[in-house]
């Protein structure tokens, strides 16, 4: 009681400007970015710096590897965003699990929890109810960049019955080199990397499990990623022989199904756009945004179509998606 009286007396002595700053500070959501020095962490921090309702809390660099200091910091924030390798992300989650009392909400940008029970997949546009699931979630797994594009293309078509769950899907894709981590970034920026390079040609990639889990595919897709000599930007492609689909739909049927699905999204980050007149698509046009655009290119004479998802691999494919999920989870 005495503490409350002293607090009220102190507040009465503050100017209007000081009162505003006091109440702003006490109402701000505190966020700790575990791994803020990496590419995704830095971008998240930059985006959060523009949000007056969020305060980013950082650990003393000297204590960065001190588990007790980290545990104490985590206990005092509203949310922890994990921008770590998978094993370290699991360690941080275990540390949060060990806390007593109110635990912070978690967004994990690693691959570690994307198909794990108890985690909500952080693509609010996935299906009806997914946005509300993110709003009410304690733990959200941020999607992978390629997976975001692939799921955005496939899930509405599978739900609509236009593409069978066992359809043989191919997903040739290209990303800017920032998606490859620090070593790839350094190689490209030092001129040590080729202008264009296909990779993961052993046909194993960490995004395939989440692509299957959240599209509903029962047949493993043929995913062929590549990297170009540009820092950021992404195209995920879905080529289709239309006559191989049940009922032999027209390309416009695919367009309409996608437009119907994403037209119901209240946030407007994912949209279906007309095919470009020149038959070209720039992978970098959505850089530094949280947007994802879908287009259906087609040649009905040959009954061919290629569906394209364009996004910033560091935006809707990483940090932009994390901030979108944070806003939904914290209501800021």
Predicted regions and their residues:
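PAPS/PAP-binding and catalytic site of the sulfotransferase fold
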Residues: 140, 254-255, 322
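Extreme N-terminal basic, low-complexity initiation segments
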Residues: 2-5
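C-terminal substrate-binding/catalytic lobe of Rossmann-fold NAD(P)-dependent oxidoreductases
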Residues: 39-71, 83, 168-173, 177-307
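Short, Lys/Arg-enriched N-terminal segments with co-localized hydrophobic residues
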Residues: 13-27
